[in-house]
């Protein structure tokens, strides 16, 4: 959400509590991306018109291709491509994807192949062909972990594989990057 709001998580929680989703909440954490973009535009006192689209499948991408002319009336169009995120999760959860993406090179190749044959490449070409800038960014990368570190916590510790939040966490401090005071890091 920081990439959309231009703020650190702690700032989002303080400035826009209605858009903040706590770590232990059952609610999806990415449901407020469009309103967070709006808050950033307003904070910088811009009068931009914008659109927000989250592409979960090729059918939605095809719809975007059809409405490109209407998108060009906006000063900003945000398109979230969920495929790479879904692929990174599937790499740990799906045996077939694990077979296809056994190495980092294979994973990148699979991602590249998807991009070259997806409607996303055509979408970018159409937008760029009209003289508009296409900026591609990411909210996080992916690292394949071969030797995970064990972090043990109580029953209230979150289950996220990328990071742990909780009290009384036990781990080897030589092998884990920890932030003891998350608020000082803006988290």
Language-model-detected regions and their locations in the chain:
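Feature captures the catalytic ectodomains and active-site-proximal regions of enzymes
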Residues: 1-187
């Amino acid at each position: 959400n920081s990439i959309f709001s231009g703020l650190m998580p702690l700032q989002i929680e303080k400035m826009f509590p209605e858009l903040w989703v706590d770590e232990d909440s059952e609610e999806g954490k990415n449901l407020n991306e469009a309103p967070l973009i709006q808050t950033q535009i307003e904070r910088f006192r811009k009068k931009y018109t914008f659109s927000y689209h989250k592409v979960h499948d090729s059918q939605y991408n095809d719809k975007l291709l059809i409405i490109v002319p209407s998108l060009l009336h906006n000063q900003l169009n945000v398109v979230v491509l969920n495929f790479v995120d879904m692929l990174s999760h599937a790499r740990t959860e799906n045996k077939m994807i694990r077979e296809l993406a056994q190495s980092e090179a294979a994973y990148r190749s699979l991602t590249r192949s998807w991009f070259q044959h997806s409607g996303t490449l055509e979408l970018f070409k159409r937008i760029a062909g009209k003289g508009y800038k296409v900026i591609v960014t990411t909210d996080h990368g992916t690292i394949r972990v071969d030797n995970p570190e064990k972090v043990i916590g109580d029953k209230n510790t979150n289950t996220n594989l990328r990071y742990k939040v909780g009290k009384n966490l036990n781990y080897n401090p030589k092998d884990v990057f920890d932030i003891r005071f998350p608020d000082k890091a803006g988290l």
